[in-house]
Amino acid sequence: MSVESIFAIIEQNKDVYIEFLRSLIQSDSFNPPGNEKNVALVIEDFLKDKGIKTEIFPFGDNRANLFAFLNDNFTGKNLLYNGHMDVVPPGSKADWKYPPLSAYIKRNKYIYGRGTADMKAALAAMIVSITILKKIGIKTSGNLIVNAVADEETGGKLGTGWCLDNVLKKRSIKCDFVLVGEASGVHPLPKAIVLGEKGHLTIKLVTSGKSAHSMAPSMGKNAIYMMSRIIENFDDLEKYLPKIDPPFTIEELKEMVAVALPPRENFDRIYNDQPLLRSMTEALTKLTKSINMISGGIKENVIPDRCEVLIDFRLFPGQTSQMIINGLKKLITDIGFKVNNATTENLPGEVYLEIYSDGESSVWEDYNKSQTVKEFKKIVENTYGKKSFFFLSAGGTDSKYYRNSGYCKETVHFGPGNIRQMHATNENLELQDFFNSIKVYTLFAHKFLSTE
């Protein structure tokens, strides 16, 4: 079937696809607590009369993962689309122009609501693409699999991690290419195709002091003062870490983007004028760290015996959580405090450290050897009418599960939406971006899978 025929199907069914997207956005799946089963049931209902087999795997309290399969054949080339059903909570609903679950459409151009950009539009587009391929009767030697997952916003272990281990691997289903639908727009640049991501590590650090009345502070040990000494020396952490080169230098990353905005002078002007682009590019080549939460003390006249901070680290591919932990322990020891691994019974003057949360970094370094990703890039460019570019993400995605486990190195993320809108109040998406993503997902799957 021709490209024009696929486009005609999309054009004829725009209203249907918009209503499907609205139904996903209107389904409460704020995480925490999750409630992703609400979304899974909407997807199942949408697919039930379209010849697409679905399987729902429930867990916990109203949570679930879902698989949709184009057919029953897994012997040839298989393509996997991954999208998460959970969204972050909306914060204060009073700050929203339109209710976060309203899926309000403005001027027939924008759709508003929590999850529009991150990432229910991509998920809807992936589901729509599998229905179009079924409708046109595509002949394949393999399968298109759409995996709608839970838990991405809280690490992904119960979602993509579980699905990979308990469905794909357990059933010996091998996939030759994986596409994760995270938003990849970076205004004012064209669409990016994302090859890798930084890892994250959140460390809880607790200083133990000794309480006393503040009229005699020398009788106690002030845990806040202890923490202030660590904070004061925190920027010295890099001295305690092994020297590792990032997978790409700043100049290499800039060159990746510049090819989409010729001539180079044009890109340099945009780069210098856009602090988000500049800071994001720089962050991709180094460890970034920030102390984001602190608590301590029980009363204004009591010497605090405990102070706690949460420290957020973003690791580039090649760095590990253990490297950061080892370096932080050495730094604290050199300050003069003992690091104790016990969670309780720490003596005054001791520091306790634990991993609060973490996620690995990941990258597909030799992407330029792949003809498949070049074909995908061409489809993106033809659909959007602009040059695309390869890049990395400063934020984490579920792509790491496929790359780092060895399941499928050839994993990228691409989706409708602008990263500025992710987790934002008044999150919104251009409807044309949604329709373009349907075209990209459908055309790529057709080219990748078709035996005609």
Give the positions of each predicted feature.
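An extended, acidic, His-containing surface patch that forms the Zn2+-binding/catalytic region
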Residues: 39, 52, 74-76, 187, ...
